[in-house]
Amino acid sequence: MFGVGIDIIEIDRIRKSYQTYGDRFLKKIFTEGERVYCFSKSNPYASLAARFAAKEAVAKALGTGIGKLLKWKEIEMCRDSRQPQVVVPEALLCSLGVKRVLLSVSHSREYATAVAIAE
């Protein structure tokens, strides 16, 4: 195993950020596919918060954080099945010696959380 990352966020924090900054906030953090998926849900803020937590957890598991080596939109959470999949630049994974990143996300009424394992 290379690393483990975990994150938790209040869903209301994402809602307030969207209400304050609008599309500018969304376009900085989330890919177009993530935005479309989340706003197709009855509670888009819970889905957005889960993806935000996932991005943070992945960055922690890789040990890069969000910044120079890894940008927000370079981490994309996809749902091809019931299990969430995460897409990260292959070149970065290779440079770190990471073969894959596993992801688990969940949310309640108030919080979203994610755990990522890089191996």
From Swiss-Prot:
- Which keywords has UniProt assigned to this entry? Cytoplasm, Fatty acid biosynthesis, Fatty acid metabolism, Lipid biosynthesis, Lipid metabolism, Magnesium, Metal-binding, Transferase
GO terms classed as biological process: fatty acid biosynthetic process
Name the predominant localization. cytoplasm
Q: What class of enzyme is it?
A: transferase
List required co-factors: Mg(2+)
Question: GO cellular component annotations, sorted alphabetically?
Answer: cytoplasm
User: Can you tell me which residues bind Mg(2+)?
Assistant: 7, 56
Q: Where in the cell is it found?
A: Cytoplasm
Q: Which transformation does this protein catalyse, written as a reaction?
A: apo-[ACP] + CoA = holo-[ACP] + adenosine 3',5'-bisphosphate + H(+)
Q: Which residues cross the membrane?
A: none
Pfam families membership: ACPS
Write out the GO MF terms: holo-[acyl-carrier-protein] synthase activity; magnesium ion binding
Write down the HAMAP family for this protein, in alphabetical order: AcpS
Q: What does this protein do?
A: Transfers the 4'-phosphopantetheine moiety from coenzyme A to a Ser of acyl-carrier-protein.
Classification via NCBIfam families: acpS (TIGR00516), pantethn_trn (TIGR00556)
Q: What is this protein called?
A: Holo-[acyl-carrier-protein] synthase
